[in-house]
UniProtKB/Swiss-Prot annotation:
Alphabetized UniProt keyword annotations: Ribonucleoprotein, Ribosomal protein, RNA-binding, rRNA-binding
Comp. bias (Basic residues): 60-71
Name listed for the protein in its UniProt record: Large ribosomal subunit protein uL4
Family to which this protein belongs: Belongs to the universal ribosomal protein uL4 family.
Source domain of life: Bacteria
Gene Ontology cellular component annotations, sorted alphabetically: ribonucleoprotein complex; ribosome
Source organism (scientific name): Shouchella clausii (strain KSM-K16) (Alkalihalobacillus clausii)
GO biological process: translation
Function: One of the primary rRNA binding proteins, this protein initially binds near the 5'-end of the 23S rRNA. It is important during the early stages of 50S assembly. It makes multiple contacts with different domains of the 23S rRNA in the assembled 50S subunit and ribosome.
């Protein structure tokens, strides 16, 4: 079982915590991580692209000239695809790009991301995280005491308004609850700052 240091809000080590081997100690699977990230990014796409076909472009209801006798090629509408300003053939239409990987694959991806954080010493576990008021400076001081000066993902067991709103204005800092932990956020942040309660909650879901 991997062991990591347990810190308090002032940055002092107050003990150690054993992490579940089947959640934080698996061999990171890069292929599964890639699949999970692509799935999440696909779900974020708006999919609102649209072009007009020949039946949707304004005008073109009248035949531009008679069929025979003009010497020109026959035409039925000025909105045919070959005309400038005509409709688009097989153009993009609004669609949803979202899809879901199997649950086992999604879980393995999260386990791989969490394990890579442990492996790369990018995991910081707190005994607790509480702020008396909504103050950005207070949150900044907590992170500074933990030597977190880059992009970090802050995770607590349940929603904490003071922590969430205090972290909101800090560049590169994202707040999540334990049940919202996902591969994309884990990988795009350099550090994972997580409370002991949140670790237990994540292990309970993924173990």
């Amino acid at each position: 079982m991997p062991k990591v240091s347990l810190f308090n809000q002032t940055g002092s080590q107050v003990g150690e915590i054993e992490l579940a081997d089947n959640v934080f100690g698996v061999e990171p699977n890069e292929s599964v991580l890639h699949d999970a990230v692509v799935m999440q990014q696909a779900s974020l796409r708006q999919g609102t692209h649209k072009t007009k076909g020949r039946s949707e472009v304004r005008g073109g209801g009248r035949k531009p000239w008679r069929q025979k006798g003009t010497g020109r090629a026959r035409q039925g509408s000025i909105r045919s695809p070959q005309w400038v300003g005509g409709g688009v053939v097989f153009g993009p239409t609004p669609r949803s790009y979202s899809y879901k990987l199997p649950k086992k694959v999604r879980r393995l991806a999260i386990k791989s991301a969490l394990s890579s954080k442990v492996k790369d010493s990018e995991l910081v576990v707190l005994d607790d995280l509480k702020l008396e008021a909504i103050k950005t400076k207070a949150m900044k001081d907590v992170l500074a005491s933990l030597s977190v000066d880059s992009k970090a993902l802050v995770v607590t067991a349940d929603y904490n308004e003071n922590v969430a709103l205090s972290a909101r204005n800090l560049p590169g800092i994202t707040f999540l609850t334990a049940d919202g932990v996902n591969v994309l956020d884990l990988l795009k942040h350099d550090k994972l700052v997580i409370t002991k309660d949140a670790v237990e909650k994540v292990e309970e879901v993924l173990a």
